[in-house]
Design a protein with these regions (language model features):
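Alpha-helical transmembrane segments of multi-pass membrane proteins, especially transporters
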Residues: 6-13, 65-74, 136
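Functional transmembrane-helix hotspots
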Residues: 81-109
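Loop-to-transmembrane helix junctions at the membrane interface
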Residues: 56-80, 84
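Cytoplasmic membrane-interface segments at the C-terminal ends of transmembrane helices
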Residues: 50-66, 148-161
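Hydrophobic alpha-helical transmembrane segments
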Residues: 109-144
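Cytosolic juxtamembrane helix and N-cap/initiation of the first transmembrane helix
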Residues: 1-13, 144-160
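Alpha-helical transmembrane segments of multipass membrane proteins
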Residues: 13, 17-21, 45, 77-81, ...
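Transmembrane alpha-helical insertion/packing segments
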Residues: 1-55
Length: 161
């Protein structure tokens, strides 16, 4: 998988998962992020990152390239998703602030010294974004590595071009 293909794949995944996030927020705006809901959301995402590694292994025997493909796809996916989540929080702040998983954020806001919940929420989301991008890229690298290894181990590697 070329870098351009990885970026495009990440953009598509970011758009798909962002739409899923927005639809879920519209259908059940106060739903908690339960372990089952998180698995249902992130499981397919991680599988797609593994596919990036698998596709990369079809072009090269270097397993590091599979991890790089997974990491790049994950980074771009999460850049898009993070931007959409921040926009969603801003557009739906009144309802989002009532979510059970926001109660800790609301307690921290009250003692933060910020005069605006919107400003505080943006501060929290923007300062947390680099760590989330790092974690997503690391998980993407691992998924890409696993996808590449599975392809190589089961002989699915076919040179392209």
């Amino acid at each position: 998988m070329t870098n351009l293909a990885a970026i495009l794949f990440g953009l598509v995944l970011g758009a798909v998962f962002s739409i899923a996030n927005l639809v879920a927020s519209r259908i059940a705006p106060l739903a908690e992020d339960t372990p089952g809901a998180l698995l249902l959301f992130y499981g397919p995402m991680f599988a797609a990152w593994a596919v990036a590694g698998l596709m990369s292994s079809r072009r090269t025997t270097r397993i590091g390239d599979c991890a790089k493909a997974g990491a790049l796809v994950a980074l771009v996916t999460f850049l898009v998703l993070t931007a959409v989540v921040i926009a969603r929080v801003n557009f739906l702040l009144d309802i989002t602030s009532q979510r059970p998983d926001w109660q800790n954020l609301m307690v921290r806001y009250r003692s933060s010294g910020f005069s605006s919940l919107r400003a505080y929420a943006n501060y929290v989301y923007f300062t947390g974004a680099p760590f989330k991008l790092l974690v997503a890229s690391s998980i993407g690298a691992l998924c890409g590595l696993l996808g590449g290894c599975s392809s190589i181990l089961w002989g699915a590697r076919r040179p392209v071009g």
